Amino acid sequence: MTYKTPLLLAIGVLAATNANASECGTVTIADMNWNSATLIANVDRFILEHGYGCDAELIPGDTMPTGTSMIEKGQPDVAPELWSNSLKDALDKGVEEKRLRYAGKALVDGGEEGFWIPAYLVKQYPEMKTIEGVKKHAKLFSHPEDKAKSAFYSCPAGWNCQISAGNLFKAMDLAGSGFDIIDPGSSAGLSGSIAKAYEREEAWFGYYWAPTAVLGKYDMVKVDFGSGVDEKEFVSCTTQADCENPKPTMYPPSPVHTITTEEFASRSPAAYNYFTKRGFTNADMNQLLAWMEDNQADGEETMFHFLENYPQIWTAWVPQDVAKKVQGAL
């Protein structure tokens, strides 16, 4: 028996390894059509495939159709980056009915919105970290069409954030300090106005959000309204086009979750556990999106850049043996 023991142990280890792989099986992952989501989906695919032995497959997805399909059909298995506010009631019901699980936060800070100014302005005028400081120095923010006014860059027309930005502009009486709302016309117009100001070290003030390539490229400071977050006010008035008497409130973070089906979580507990720990800060995601844009890279190329250059981040999400397998596959 003593001669057989090592062989039996080896067979047992091999059987356990094969069981882990078959336990995971085929995993379908929604590949959403924006940059941070396709990056996360590719990272998940690679780690599940090479670290956990899953047969991981990316399938096209988007917020509403993916969430609905997961609830009604149990597919795909994973939605890596779901901005859950837009279908919160349906997701909560899916969890209650044991069809879905909130696995973790894809973006640990949540989606971040606010009014921003360049960091070099705050270095020169520290009081401009606050809305009162910005109003005090309103004349620095040159209007491209009217020298008598100051420029506030809002969301492009038709975007939901145009409503909230306009209501907050009114709530803080920015017009009373000489500011005028500028419609940049498009996302490119808005980001281009920041790039132009930064290249010339000029004053810029307006709405923006994270995670984005722009906030990865340019050091911007979110202006403090001095109001804190009033979620009730934000939902009932700030975001409503017919809000007559808006009050100041900072933007509440938008929850950004990773959602899995209950069937996947039950079938593949080790792989599911990875999703409970995997999450990006906005600062890290901003940097990755900036690299992605500068290099005209797709989700897969940016995934390799991330795994090869940020091991201190992703190795904390997985056991040591899984990390070694992933590193060996790079």
Can you annotate each of these PLM segments?
Residues T68-M70, P76-W83, Y153-F234:
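Ligand-binding pocket segment of bilobal, Venus flytrap-like solute-binding proteins
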Residues S36, Q162-S177, P184-E201, A213, ...:
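An extracytoplasmic/periplasmic, membrane-proximal ligand-sensing/linker region
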Residues M64-Y120:
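N-terminal segment of the mature folded domain
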Residues K217-Y274, R278-G279:
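C-terminal lobe and pocket-closing loops
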Residues E112-Q124, P255-R267, A290-W291:
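A bilobed periplasmic-binding-protein/Venus flytrap-type ligand-binding module shared by bacterial periplasmic
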Residues S36-C54:
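Short, polar/charged alpha-helical segment
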Residues S22-S36, D55-I59, K149-Y153, F275:
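Short, well-ordered beta-strand elements
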Residues L100-S154:
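A conserved helix-loop-strand patch within extracytoplasmic ligand-binding domains
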